[in-house]
Amino acid sequence: MIKKLIHQATTLFVASVIATAALAAETVTVGGKFFTEQYILSEMTTQLLQAHSIPVKQITGMGSSLVRKAQENGEIDLYWEYTGTALIVYNKVTEQLSPKQTYNRVKELDGKKGLVWLKPSNANNTFALAVRKQDVAGNGLHTLSDLADAYRNKKEIKMAGTAEFIGRSDGIKNLQKAYDFRVPRSQLKSMEAGLTYTALKDGLVDVALVYATDGRIAAFDFELLKDDKQFFPSYAVVPVIRKETLEQYPELEVILNQLSVKLDDATMQRLNARVDIDKKSVRTVAAEFLTANNLL
């Protein structure tokens, strides 16, 4: 009888130890969307966690709504999100807010859903309109107000944008209202996102919709027109983590914030260009950046 009790107690103790160890070693799932910048951010995050002996797996190539839903459902623990996307798409807030207000609002709203927004980076992957630098001296375009003046003066300026940009609330329709101009239909070309860059580079259009941290901006020698009326929402990229994951691995806040403060527009442009233009692997680019910044 005593041996039986000892055996049962031993079995329960071993089971408890195994359960505790399994909990302690719970894997952190890092997510990512389906474009270069997100692959890089996801890979850097994964390498950082591995360097700190945190068990991690990576799921990338997901659509924006899918990765968000996966995080809310607990399938993804951590990924890098954009403040404007969270504000407008996920939380349905349409009022115009400053970058700081945008961050504070999504942090508050998502906090109620168990999602923690960590320190925002200075990388703002917002919409922008770009021109070729070689043309600036001749056309005098430096700001969106300059562009609006040119259209009001009936100058022929061909613009390339995506179908989404042409149709959405922070797209061309409200941009025209904010800056008081109109692009003639014949001068507005709708095309897939990647094609706007090549159309501008090849001289098929004069102005093109781009994303501010895209590596092709520097590689193709583009200049971004300053959004002097701050029309476009802030799309600061920020690590977002499930509250329960952060409670289990509180050191993640420091680890991820140390990476976040190293990122700005120029840095992300260079990293993206290393992959898209120089054809380096995402893993190599991530490792080189982390090493160069003493994060590994």
PLM feature segments, named:
Residues 60-64, 74-87, 102, 193, ...:
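Beta->alpha turn/N-cap motifs
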Residues 36-55, 71, 173-177:
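Short, polar/charged alpha-helical segment
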Residues 90-118, 204, 216-230:
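Ligand-binding "clamshell"
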Residues 127-137, 236-249:
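A bilobed periplasmic-binding-protein/Venus flytrap-type ligand-binding module shared by bacterial periplasmic
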Residues 154-227:
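Ligand-binding pocket segment of bilobal, Venus flytrap-like solute-binding proteins
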Residues 27-43, 60-64, 164-167:
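Extracytoplasmic "Venus flytrap"
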Residues 37, 166-181, 250-296:
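An extracytoplasmic/periplasmic, membrane-proximal ligand-sensing/linker region
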Residues 101-158, 261-265:
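A conserved helix-loop-strand patch within extracytoplasmic ligand-binding domains
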